[in-house]
Amino acid sequence: MATLPTTRRAVMAGAALLPFLRMPQARAKTPGVLTFGLSSYPPTIQPWANSGTAAATIKLMIYRGLTSYGADGKLQPELAESWTRETDTSWVFKLRDAKFQNGEKVTSADVKWTFEQIAGERSTAYFRAEVQGFERVETPDDLTVRIVTKQPVVTLPVWMASYHLPIISRNSPRGQFVGAGPFVLKGQERGVSLDLEPFEGYYKPGLPKLRGIRVVAYADENLRTAALQSGDVDLIEYVPWQAMDAITANPELSLDAVDGAFMFLVFNGSKPPFNDARVRKAVAHAINRDDLVKAAFFGRGSGLAHLPIPESSAFYNADFKNAWNYDPALAKKLLAEAGHGGGINCSLLSTAQYGMHKDTAEVVQQHLAAVGINVTLNLPDWATRVAVGNRGQYDMAVMGTAADSNDPDGLASFIDGALSPSYVRSFGLKTERITQLLAAGRAEFDEAKRRAIYREMEQVAITEAPMVGLTWRSQGYAMRKAVTGFRNLPGALTFYSGLTFETAAVG
């Protein structure tokens, strides 16, 4: 099946290559200030909200949590210098000597206050449901925090590394959020750029190395790439897949790409027709993922016909690899069984701001049409797409991201319908058995037993299809050779790479 018109793909590839014909002299810059080309202007940088990965990158410059990740992807101490498990439901975190950007010390009272805000009755925090699972937060002294959970949570230290769980000063001015990260937001031109300066009181000696970061939003991926080539920016995220070969061949630039991000579909399960698992499975079997990899990612990826658990994971189940295989005849059969033999008309939410989202939506539209599902595309800007998704104003939606961590509990964000509504997961779609198994998995400390639990969970998810995997994709940053110390973190942690701005430098 044709995926994108040949002429369009040729134009896209040509546009990607044109900027690399030569490297003109870069404009004058302030020494030590890195200019970063962001893929979109963040809808919000509220610390506990999930508004996309562009916002997450800025949050990782400004805020820090109790734990985080090193450049090797391993969990490491952050505001907490150590942590221990006292009992199955009790964890103790020892805080380091650190300051917030208002000059005040980070204390256990700030940690407790942060969790109280997240769990509040009117909170819209991404981790609200998880933090509401805390029985209590104790503060034996200024540098000791004891978190007592209602149920065992083996992954609690991993939760604390999330860029959605930074610790904020309890003395932050109303409507503001004072963090303890390496950079301070000093100015912004809404929709265009943000300027950050180093926090002189940062708790890591000698860091950050940069004298500042200027963040410029380039919604157009070709303009973002051209800005790197011309020297207007030093580093860009979301390198277009059609430009990766040209960047690799350019001696003035370097590409840092990893596999770990993925594309998938979510559904509005609060109403017909996608409240029926048979219809969702029909969608899963209607899509040729090889076509999708070629069309949207220029071959830099692979099909994903199961839950996004990578082969490198101890929790990977090889026999589920092709669970949602391309089988249009089966898709039609499932639709007929669900009472939709005459076809379905529905909408598909995506965004035109990211080429991969738009291209994915177009290919999915073509494949679904072949089995009788007629799709109308809705392609707003990213901020609108997030808002519409959060409100459930769609039938199906294209999503692309990475898991919250390399632990399978990180999949809860995408398939646990008991969590607060979010654009990253299906709307109004609750599968009680999945919620139960996810809870059992995070409560089990024996790894062999955890593997058995997550195997059953994946089997249920394949049957119920609360999300439909589409493709793994390569996720890249590109930079001038003068940039050092910035790393693309491995696997699912690629969107935590903003942590390494603290060690980045530019010549």
Language model features: what each stretch is:
Residues 37-87, 116, 178-179:
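N-terminal lobe/hinge region of extracytoplasmic solute-binding protein
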Residues 74, 153-214, 220-222, 328-329, ...:
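Gly/Pro-rich hinge or "lid" segments in bacterial periplasmic/extracellular proteins
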Residues 81-124, 146, 227, 273:
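Aromatic- and charge-enriched surface segment that lines or borders ligand/interaction sites
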Residues 84, 127-170:
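Surface-exposed binding/hinge segments that line
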Residues 201-246, 374-376:
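Ligand-site clamp/hinge motif
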Residues 303-337, 354-358:
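Structural transition elements
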Residues 370-385, 412-481, 505-507:
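Extracytoplasmic/peripheral linker and loop segments enriched in polar/acidic and small residues
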Residues 479-507:
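Long beta-strand-rich cores associated with HINT superfamily self-processing modules
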